[in-house]
Amino acid sequence: MRQALLERFLRYIKIDTQSDGKNLESPSTPSQFEFAKLLKLELEELGFHRVELSDKGYLSASVPKTIEGVPCIGFIAHLDTAPDFSGANVTPQLINDYDGSEIKLGEDEVLSPELFPHMLKYLGKTLITTDGTSLLGGDDKAGISEIITALHYLLEHPEIPHGEIRLCFTPDEEIGRGADHFDVPEFGAQWAYTIDGGQLGELEFENFNAATAVITAKGNNCHPGTAYGVMVNAQTMAARFHAKMPLHDTPEGSKDYDGFFHLINMQGQTEEAELTYIIRDFDLELFEKRKTWLTERVKSYNADLVLGSLEIEITDSYFNMKEQILPYPHIIDIAEKAITNQGVTPLIKPIRGGTDGSRLSYMGLPCPNIFTGGHNFHGKHEYICLESMEKAVDVIIDICKLTAEEQQA
């Protein structure tokens, strides 16, 4: 399976499928739909059943059950890559028998174990890197490659007992819309796993509670030559507001179970300016306190203004899936055992972000997240270990086996 997995992955990452948060259509970019069409043809040629591509860009398929009485489970990955960094003209480098040295990425960049010490875990392994001009696309084309490789193996080995297995590849996960048009009843699984994690062994069923806050500064524009006592510069108002945000309460100042405020966009002119923050916290009570605190800060800021004003609008994005998964401990137990069976120590940790699984869990499909084998997603230093990808394939296969064994026990 190693060569098929590698060839599949290298083929997929050459297709630029960045999503576009400014486009409200689904998928947000035509390239995602074209990629889904190619995958549909591949799944049909490989013998998958019920291969269907929706008009919103969701591709689903099935592996038929080989025994009765076993729950239908699913595996999910996403078609898009992050809009944060170029996904075009991906030129991967294969580093066989990695020796622990820094890896040159094109002419000007390096991938160094001094900056990324986790590279030293992969001595003697095969690494796949970028050439420094793009992201790699392992998030989540590694997940797609691993799911197809694993489930094709099960198709070719009907002697292995398992229930019906569903897969779905979703668009626009990177812009938070991957679950928008996901049809949970049609998918038909009792639970699922997103294959969208990072390093070898990761198993995640906690994620941030998430919201977006848009703060609009309302100023007053006029000719600068006659501005005295009249002009109110909305950009200055916005800048002063942000300057008084807590310095430690940011992504770069937080880790583990810490939450944060993150200014992701600042734009405007004299008349009107806009600050966009994302709000994150694992604890629901602290999450609500963060939203209240920011709202009160706006009110307090307005109270000190003579001219101009700030307005705030907060929209919830997703919630911590832990609350929806803990009532079904067997979902985690099976995945943990499958990882352990491969000689890998499960790395159970919170996701400092979100996945399709977080929203799907609240839509009635409990859906923890499993590793792909990659590191440094969304940038030019992204890399993935081929042997870790192989382990992910083995974990997927073993989850299907263990689900059947548990039901028969």
Swiss-Prot record:
GO biological process: peptide catabolic process; proteolysis
Keyword Hydrolase: yes
PROSITE patterns: ARGE_DAPE_CPG2_1
Binding, Zn(2+) 1: 78, 139, 196
Annotated HAMAP family: Aminopeptidase_M20
Localization per Swiss-Prot or TrEMBL: Cytoplasm
Active site: 80, 173 (proton acceptor)
PANTHER family: PEPTIDASE T (PTHR42994:SF1)
Protein name, entry field: Peptidase T
Matches recorded under InterPro entries: ArgE/DapE_CS (IPR001261), Bact_exopeptidase_dim_dom (IPR036264), Peptidase_M20 (IPR002933), Peptidase_M20_dimer (IPR011650), Peptidase_M20B (IPR010161)
Keywords: Aminopeptidase, Cytoplasm, Hydrolase, Metal-binding, Metalloprotease, Protease, Zinc
Gene Ontology molecular-function annotations: metallopeptidase activity; tripeptide aminopeptidase activity; zinc ion binding
EC id: 3.4.11.4
